[in-house]
Design a protein with these regions (language model features):
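Terminal alpha-helical segments
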Residues: 1-146
């Protein structure tokens, strides 16, 4: 009986160790994406990052959902990110809001990585410039787009 109990406790400890490792990996990816998003939005607001021109069609941009577009146009805002498989990336896309024609709006999408490429965290910020006012809205992308 003690052997069975010991084996069960051992299996439970292994499961807990794996879960802790997965949580650590997800946190690593989240912090990488959050850092990239902060750096890219700050650079966009300061004017030190290239801001694409407004698109012809209305609606929120969807280039970040396409692997080819994201990989080709994303920038890497840091030189190194310890503990991540790849450096975090961000993509800035212009956004035309029909209800606010005087506003210049952008969607900034950031992707951070954990210890391996499969662990990713995606975050977005919507930045709207209208006159001297800057609006910032943050959101987490729940499902990986690709």
């Amino acid at each position: 009986m003690m052997l069975v109990t010991s084996a069960a406790w051992f299996e439970a400890s292994l499961l807990e160790a794996r879960n802790a490792s997965l949580i650590t990996d997800r946190l690593q990816a989240f912090h990488a994406a959050d850092g990239a998003l902060s750096l890219c939005t700050r650079a966009l607001v300061n004017g030190s990052m290239f801001a694409p021109s407004a698109p012809l069609q209305p609606g929120e941009p969807a280039g970040w959902r396409q692997k080819g577009t994201f990989e080709a146009q994303a920038v890497v805002p840091v030189v190194t990110w310890p503990g991540s498989a790849r450096l975090p990336q961000c993509l800035v896309e212009a956004w035309r809001i029909d209800s606010r024609p005087a506003a210049r709006a952008f969607v900034v999408t950031a992707r951070g990585f954990g210890v391996d490429d499969d662990t990713q965290s995606w975050l977005q910020a919507q930045i709207v410039f209208e006159g001297t006012r800057v609006e910032r809205h943050w959101r987490r992308v729940v499902a990986r787009p690709f």
